[in-house]
Every structure is written in C-alpha cells, then in structure tokens.
Amino acid sequence: MSVLSKLMRAGEGKILRKLHRIADQVNSIEEDFADLSDAELRALTDEYKQRYADGESLDDLLPEAFATVREAAKRVLGQRHYDVQIMGGAALHMGYVAEMKTGEGKTLVGTLPAYLNALSGEGVHIVTVNDYLAERDSELMGRVHKFLGLNVGCILANQTPAQRREMYACDITYGTNNEFGFDYLRDNMAWSKDELVQRGHNFAIVDEVDSILVDEARTPLIISGPADQATKWYGDFAKLVTRLKKGEAGNTLKGIEETGDYEVDEKKRTVAIHESGVAKVEDWLGIDNLYESVNTPLVGYLNNAIKAKELFKKDKDYVVLDGEVMIVDEHTGRILAGRRYNEGMHQAIEAKEGVDIKDENQTLATITLQNFFRLYKRHDHDGKEQPGLSGMTGTAMTEAAEFHQIYKLGVVPIPTNRPMVRKDQSDLIYRTEVAKFEAVVDDIEEKHRKGQPILVGTTSVEKSEYLSQQLSKRGVQHEVLNAKQHDREATIVAQAGRKGSVTVATNMAGRGTDIKLGGNPEDLAEAELRQRGLDPEEHIEEWAAALPAALERAEQAVKAEFEEVKELGGLYVLGTERHESRRIDNQLRGRSGRQGDPGESRFYLSLGDDLMRLFKAQMVERVMSMANVPDDVPIENKMVTRAIASAQSQVETQNFETRKNVLKYDEVLNRQREVIYGERRRVLEGEDLQEQIQHFTNDTIDAYVQAETAEGFPEDWDLDRLWGAFKQLYPVKVTVEELEEAAGDRAGLTADYIAESIKDDVREQYEAREKQLGSEIMRELERRVVLSVLDRKWREHLYEMDYLQEGIGLRAMAQKDPLVEYQREGFDMFQAMMDGIKEESVGYLFNLEVQVEQQVEEVPVEDAAPSLDKGAQDAVPAQAGARPEIRAKGLDAPQRRDLHFSAPTVDGEGGVVEGEFTDGEPAQAQSDGLTRAERRKQAKGGRRRKK
C-alpha cells in the first residue's frame, strides 16, 4: 500500500465510529416507527419538510428520516435495511464514496440519503450506469418513496423536453450520467426559458461511482453538429494503405535501417510513416511534396487510414452491424450505440470496411463528466456550501487518492453484513493462449460435471465467442453474454447462480444484477404477481399486501437448490485474462461470495495476453527461454505474478495521469464555460439587456478609439478610418468636422472627447431604433441577437481551443510548459471572443432588417402536458402574456441543425443518442393547445432515435 493510500485511510476508523453511532441511534428508535399505521408513516414526510423549513438541519433529521425509510422498505419491498446499509446511507449523506461489496444491497442504501435530501425540496439525482438500471431502480426503489409521499422521476433517452422537465421537477430523479450531462448542455443551448428542463444541481448519488467518475472520466460529453468535410479522400486512402507494408523503425546509431513503409507502436497507439511510404503516396497521388502546407489535411487522412488498418481490429475494437461501424467498449465489452471516434478516425474505419461514410461533426457544446459532477453543491440554512456529490461502488479503495484529488471525495469502506468466505486461488500462467483456453475448458467441464455454477469473464467479444465454440465442441451447455445481446442480459445474470449453469461474459463491470445462488426469488415472486394482473405502480396497496406471501413461496422453491449449490462450493468465477485495472478484476471476483455465501475464484493467464505483451515484453521473453516447460503445464513463478501486478499498476498510473491531464486542460475551458453559460442564463431569465447592450456599446467604442488614437498627436490620427469603422457598427450621424468645430481645431481633439461624443450619438440612434421598432420588439431583438452571437462565437471558440490543444504539446520542445502556454493562449482567445461578442451584438442590433411575425401566445406548459403531480408546476417556467416572434437575415433561427451526441458509456446502454431535429413544424400541426415552439420541441423529442 502506498504512503498516499495510508494517509488517505488515516481517518477511516473515526468516520466508521461515527457511522456506527448513527446506526445505533436509528436502531434505538426503530420500534416506535413499527407501531405507526401506513397513513401516519406517510404523514411524517410533511412533518420533516416543515421542521426543515423552520430551521432544523438535515443532519438533525437524519436518524428519524432513516428509520422512516427502513420501516417503509420493510412494508413495501419486504426488505429491512441492515445496520451496515444504514451506515452506508449516512456515509453518502455526508458526501463520501461508500465502498460496499457486491451483493450488500447498494441500491437499497441509496433510498436513505435520497429521501433525506429530498426533504429540502431542491431535488436529488440518482445516477446509474444504464437506462435499464435507471428504469428498474426508479420503479423498484420508487415504490418506497411514493409510499412516503414523494414523487420519483426517471430520465430516459427517448423522452421529449416536456417529459424531462416533469421528471426533473420530481423530488428524486433517476437517470444515467449521459442523460444528466446532455440535459445540462442542451439547457445551455436553449433559446427560451421555457425550453430549460433542469432545475439545478443540488445532490447526486452516483451508483458504480468508480466506473462513472474514473473509467469514463477521460471521455468528454460532446454535442456536435455537421461540419463541411470531403469524404472522397477517406475511400482513396483506405485503398492506398493496403499497398503499403508495415515495417520496423531504424536506428542510425546502431546502424539498423528502417524497413517497410511505416511503423506501428501498439503500446502508445501511434503510427509513423517512413520515407519510402511518403514517396509511394506522393507518387500515387501525383503530388510533389506531401508535407507542403496545402497538403496538410492529406497527412491526417493517411495517418488515420494506417491506424484504421493496424490499430483498430474488427470484433475487438468495433463491430459492423447493418452496414454501420459500432464501437465496442474496452471496459465492458458492450456496443456503444451511436458513439463515433472523432478526428476523422471513424470515417477512416468506415472506408476500410467499405460501408457508407458519414459526415464529420463540429463541437457545439462539451463538458467532461469530472466537471459536470463538480457542479453539484448543497447549501445549508446559512447559505454555506457543502459538497453535493456522493457515490457507492464495490471497489473504490484502489482509487481513493484519485477521488480525493479530483473530486475532494473521501472513501469509506463499509464492513460487510456477514464475513466473506470466498476462496481466491492463485493465478495459473500458461505459455500460450491456446494452451490457456484448453485448461480453462477442462476446468469448466470438471466443475460443470458436479453441478457447480460457473461464471467466466473474458476481455473481448472475440474471446468470449472463441471460448463458446470450444465449450460447444465438448457439449457443455452454456449462456454467452456480450455486447451483441443486451436484451436477455438481466435474465441470464439473475439465473447464473443456478445449479449447473455456465455463463460466459465479457467484462461484467456495472451489470447491476445480483447473482444469487439457486436463482433469484425476487424475480420469481414479481413474475407471479404480474401474472395475477397486479402492477406495483398502479396497485401500490394490493402489491404490498400480496408480496410477502409470494416471496415466501419463491424462497421455498429456491432454498432447496441454494443448499445444494452451497454444498458444491458456491459460484466459481473464472477469469481468462487480467484486465488493465485491478479494480475490474476485483469486480469480477466480487460476483462470487456475496452475503457470506461460499465461492471460489481463479484467473488463468498466458504470456501472450495483451497486458503482458504490451507492458512486460522483455520479461516474458526471459521467462519463456528459462522455463523449459511444455505448453499444457502452468508456470508457477513469483516473478511472473509480480510482473503482472506491476504491469497493472503501471497501466493504472498511466490512466490516472491521462485523466489528470484531461482535467487540467478542461479546467481552463471550464472557467470559460462558467462565464459564457452564466451570461446565457441571465439572457434567458429575461433580464433586461438594455443596460448590458449599453456596456457592450461603450466597450466597443472605447476599443475602436483606443486602437486608432494610441499613438501620435491628433493631427496624425486617421479619423476617416475610425469613422469608417463606426459606420459599419451603426448609422453615425455626428461628423469629424462637427467635432473639430466644437473643439476649436483638430489639435484640440482628445480620445476621451471623441469617445464621449460617439457614445452620445449611439444613445440617440438606439432610442430612435427603439421608437421605430417598439420597445417590446427591441427587447426581444436584443435577447435574440445576444444569444445568437454568443452561441456562434462560443462554437468558433471551442473549435479554436480544440485546435490549440492538439498542437500545444510541441511547445515542450521549446522548453515551455504546454499547460501554461495553453492557459495563456486560451485566455487571450477568450478575451478576443468576448470583445467579438460585444462588437457583433452591437452591429447586429443596429443593422439587421427586422420582420415581426404574429404575436405568439405562450401557453403555460403545465396546461399542455398532463402533470405528474401538482409539485411539478413549480419548475415549469410559464411566461405570462405574449412575446413577439421576429425574423432577421443573419440571425440564427431558434431551431437546431442536426445534432449528434457523443459521450462515454459505462455500460453500452447509455450509449449516445443521435438527434435529427426538423426545421419547421411537424407534419401534422393540429391545434392541440400548444405554442408553435412547443410543437416544434415535441417534434424534436419524438424524432430522437437510438442507434
């Protein structure tokens, strides 16, 4: 354990003692709540809300609130929170990451802090890793909250903005990290206050926090729209590179000549083209110099084509389905619906596979998950800020330092409810991969013969299919669970603990379903009640009454098989390869031995595994030559075991550095994002922009005058050029001659005098413009102009910042720190953008030809869509009265181009949603009591599809 980790764990005992005290407090009052009727229990929610409003803090209410939820869960779900679950709930409320082993009931733990924090009325977000879990948990755990009188919402990929707004208005909202993040970004692209769906970021509980905040933190959430790009080159280069040969790098010092046309570094995932390759490409394309500035884009196409050929392997990194290239997640082995590689990489792979090549996209809005989750802040009664983020996972201690450094989150390991008795066997290492899989199949066959349930973990779809073929040859019945079959997933996992079952799965990280020995009684009981026509949503009371008996019957059925499986040694987890991260290995192991059940785990490795090949190549070669053992005999070697551990920590450190680096660079953009989004929000909130436009005008005029009069005497100033600039800005009425006359002569002019005179003139022209258009239209024009210019400038700025970041690494060669340079230049670009926004806003305001359309009646949205609950109305911004709708050439219309969403996905399901937004009305715009804007929004929402 590193020194840093030890320091991290220094205060652990103190926190655990505090959590024990809280659990004891809750236990001491448990009986008082058991005697209450359902109605009395429900009435407590309003009482707590009132006490909070009267000045009590949430910490004061904690013991009673937890006892209330414990009693409600007992009545509605037939599950009572264990003491360790109460401790976990308290840790979450205090803003920690609670490390709870698999099968300790993390989902149930979330109900405690969610209920407590919902009492403040600010909203609680519970973040899961995929849509299936969000829906399942909001339905299952939502029963407890609904029983206590709170309303629960769930954000899913295909909802319309009106539905989303209603879900966010609920006390507790479930959803995936991507949906929460995209809604934040879309809110900051909204054209009016009525389009906003979120109501702030108060408190978030993140399930599988390590997957979301660590594994996926390197990939930002991006909303992009189409950019102009020539697609013909991708196809041409895909054909070209098939004629180039891979070779090795040369070394002039050792006199080794380079071979082939290009070299590939698998470890760094880079390629480099050799002289011979360049010559061939120039020859084939008929150009003189590939590296001339005019040919720069071609170098990018060439590099991407080589990478697509060498580094991106079909059925490992991506699959081709229905003529589309789909990325496979390296962590979970699932298909990432709709996610595309950027920088033209995806197009290069499409060209390689010969499928349709889609357009490249330009970033319109972006945020990393790290910065999104740092938005969550709670405020106590005195307005003091407290962290609003917490999370739970089975494996967090290995990343404790990272949680602390980046999110300021402490990690608390919560003890298990029953002691752990799983046997973790030592690794078996084989010389070749073929021999390893032979041994794996032998082991599976032997264990299967006696009936022990087996779960096999593989690292890629390819390997799980290879193993499946081997098992079929031996006649072993088994289930395969990988990226290609999402739908049956939960059912397969729930039954993976039955006698004689064999389940082969790509990374099981974050699958969220418990493997219970002998089968899952909850699933059986639920199926029985649904067959009888009951629904937990509609028949809350009847469901609660019928559940205990159904559960008992299901448990009896499962119990006999459970005892049998227990005798056989419980679930056997077999890993066929070590993952890059120790944490994912531990997650796989953790599927077995839950709640004190027996279990066993073992990893089979070979010296040809990716991890060993990439990080410990020389050492592997040494062992191979030393160990003169036949292929089918495992190598027992301390050195190899140590090498594996060191390779894993090497990869982890490397990934942590990458994430820290991403964050440092995004930090620069984050501060800029806060300024721009804050500005946008003020415009949307309907703040009167008159004063702001005044500031914009004054600043622009000062800048113009300053630029022209900074040097020389008044006689030297080029006032004609200055007036030319003013004329482009607004219709100038005052002339140079008038000013000279007033000042006596040219020499009497001062910069201040010119600036003041022009400002007075602008004010007059502004008032004249307002009189001509009418003040209401003028206000709407200001709003639209500022939003339109702000958005366009921010889009251009994001593009520039991307471009800057790509090349900034080269500054290191000039002995400069790339990050410092990026901060400095990024700040200069931001200043230039802000000046541009001011200047263009003023210019547009005076020079646009405005047409006023008919007045649009703004119908309060709650009338348009049936509301879940009266409480939902608070969050719906209904704008009274009518607002003029205006059109002007050069002003963005409040519709979106085709938008594309790209985000990390922990579990494939969250994927990426691709938007196709229509330009005008939906085809049937029947009069349905909605405004045009809302009908358009509904059309947008309805057309979103998952790919």
Swiss-Prot record:
Gene Ontology biological process terms from the UniProt entry: intracellular protein transmembrane transport; protein import; protein targeting; protein transport by the Sec complex
SUPFAM superfamilies: Helical scaffold and wing domains of SecA, P-loop containing nucleoside triphosphate hydrolases, Pre-protein crosslinking domain of SecA
An annotated Gene Ontology molecular function: ATP binding
Biased composition (Basic residues): 934-947
GO cellular component, one term: cell envelope Sec protein transport complex
Recorded superkingdom: Bacteria
Basic and acidic residues bias locations: 884-900
Compartments, as annotated in UniProt: Cell membrane; Cytoplasm
Record CDD domains: DEXDc_SecA, SF2_C_secA
InterPro entries cross-referenced by the UniProt entry: Helicase_ATP-bd (IPR014001), Helicase_C-like (IPR001650), P-loop_NTPase (IPR027417), SecA (IPR000185), SecA_CS (IPR020937), SecA_DEAD (IPR011115), SecA_motor_DEAD (IPR014018), SecA_preprotein_X-link_dom (IPR011130)
Keyword tags: ATP-binding, Cell membrane, Cytoplasm, Membrane, Nucleotide-binding, Protein transport, Translocase, Translocation, Transport
Region Disordered: start-end pairs: 864-947
UniProt-annotated binding residues for ATP: 85, 103-107, 514
The keyword Cytoplasm is annotated on this UniProt entry: yes
Membrane topology category: Peripheral membrane protein
Matching HAMAP family: SecA
Subunit structure: Monomer and homodimer. Part of the essential Sec protein translocation apparatus which comprises SecA, SecYEG and auxiliary proteins SecDF. Other proteins may also be involved.
Function in brief: Part of the Sec protein translocase complex. Interacts with the SecYEG preprotein conducting channel. Has a central role in coupling the hydrolysis of ATP to the transfer of proteins into and across the cell membrane, serving as an ATP-driven molecular motor driving the stepwise translocation of polypeptide chains across the membrane.
Family: Belongs to the SecA family.
Stated name of the protein: Protein translocase subunit SecA
Source taxonomy: Bacteria, Bacillati, Actinomycetota, Actinomycetes, Kitasatosporales
Gene field: secA
